[in-house]
Amino acid sequence: MFRRLLIATVVGILAAFAVAGFRHAMLLLEWLFLNNDSGSLVNAATNLSPWRRLLTPALGGLAAGLLLMGWQKFTQQRPHAPTDYMEALQTDGQFDYAASLVKSLASLLVVTSGSAIGREGAMILLAALAASCFAQRFTPRQEWKLWIACGAAAGMAAAYRAPLAGSLFIAEVLFGTMMLASLGPVIISAVVALLVSNLINHSDALLYNVQLSVTVQARDYALIISTGVLAGLCGPLLLTLMNACHRGFVSLKLAPPWQLALGGLIVGLLSLFTPAVWGNGYSTVQSFLTAPPLLMIIAGIFLCKLCAVLASSGSGAPGGVFTPTLFIGLAIGMLYGRSLGLWFPDGEEITLLLGLTGMATLLAATTHAPIMSTLMICEMTGEYQLLPGLLIACVIASVISRTLHRDSIYRQHTAQHS
C-alpha cells in the first residue's frame, strides 16, 4: 500500500508539470501571435482588428487540421479522440503516445487561436499520458489503468483546482472500471497535483471569485431544485444539438483542415458581434460572476457563445467541452434568475445563486455525474454552503437527463470518434 501511495505522489507531481507545461505553451503562443499577455483570449480578441478577429480562429483550425491530416497520412492511421485516456481506461490501459502528443499540439493550436473549445481536455490528456509513461516503465501491467486514472484525476485537479471533484470524476464517469479501494491513490495524486500546481503558479486562489452573501433558505432551495429540473431538460437538448452539428459538418465531406477552418471561421464571424465567444469561457464566467449583466446582454452573449461552442465541437476541434458547458449552464441559470428576479427584491443575489446552480446542474445533466458536479462548483468557488441544495438539484438534473438521453457527453463523444 505504501508503494502505491508513493507512486501516486509521483504521478501527481508529473501531472502538475504536464498541465503547467501546456498552460505556459499556450501563454507563449498567445504572446507571440496575438500580442496578448493577459492570459484572457477575450481580451486578446477585443484588442484585435475586426479582420484579424475574423480570420485567426479559422487559421488556427486550418493549421491544426493540416497537422492532424499530415500525421494521419504519415502513419496511415485514423487519429484517436483527444480524450483517449477514457478509452485507455476502458480497454487495455495503453496509449498511442505519438498520436496523443500530436492531438495535444493540435489542441494547443485551436485553443490559442480562439476556438470556443476547452483547453483542459488536452491538459488532462497530457497528465494521463505522463502517468502512463511512468507506469509502463516502473509498475506491473495490471496496475496501468489505475495510474492512468490517477493521472487524469490529477490533471483535472491541477486544471480546475478541484482535487475531490477530479477524483470523483474518475469514479463516477468511469464507474465499474475501478475498485473503490483504488480511490485512495487517485485522491493522493489529485491533492499532490493541486499542491504542486499552486507552487508552480505561486497562487492558491480559487478558480472563480464569487461574492455570494445570501443565506440559503427554503425559498432558495425551491429555486435551486427548479433550476435542476430546467438543466435536466436543457442537458439532453445541448447534447442533441452537439450531435446534430457534428453530423452536419461530417455531411459536408470536407478534408480535416477545411472542416476545422470552417468551424473557426464561424467563431470568427460570431466574435465580430462579441469577443466573448473566443476561448473556453473562463474569463466570461468570471466577469458574469463578478457583475451579473442585464437579461438581454446575457441572452445575446449566450446565443453567440452557444453557436461558437457548437461550431468548434461539431467541426472536430481537438479539446474539451467541460469549461464551455460551465458557461452555458451559468448563462441558463442567470437567465432564469433574471426572469425570477423581477418578482423578488434581492434579484441580484438570486441571479448569482441560480447562475452557480446552473453551472453545477447542467454539468451533471451532460456528464451524468451529480456528485462530481456538485463538488466541482463548491471547490472552484468556495461556496460550500450550497452543497446540500446543489447535490439534490444535480441528482434531479442527472436523472431527468439520463431518462431523456441515455448517453453522457463523454460516451457520445467516444461514439462519434469510433
Curated annotation (Swiss-Prot):
The chain crosses the membrane at residues 5-25, 54-74, 146-166, 168-188, 222-242, 258-278, 291-311, 316-336, 352-372, 380-400. It is found in: Cell inner membrane. The gene is clcB. Pfam families: Voltage_CLC. Probably acts as an electrical shunt for an outwardly-directed proton pump that is linked to amino acid decarboxylation, as part of the extreme acid resistance (XAR) response. It comes from the Bacteria. It is a multi-pass membrane protein. This is Voltage-gated ClC-type chloride channel ClcB. Its main location: membrane. Keywords: Cell inner membrane, Cell membrane, Chloride, Chloride channel, Ion channel, Ion transport, Membrane, Transmembrane, Transmembrane helix, Transport, Voltage-gated channel. SUPFAM superfamilies: Clc chloride channel. NCBIfam families: PRK01610.1. InterPro entries: Cl-channel_core (IPR014743), Cl-channel_volt-gated_ClcB (IPR023790), ClC (IPR001807), ClC-type_chloride_channel (IPR050368). GO terms for biological process: response to acidic pH. GO terms for molecular function: voltage-gated chloride channel activity. HAMAP family: CLC_ClcB. GO terms for cellular component: chloride channel complex; plasma membrane. Belongs to the chloride channel (TC 2.A.49) family. ClcB subfamily.
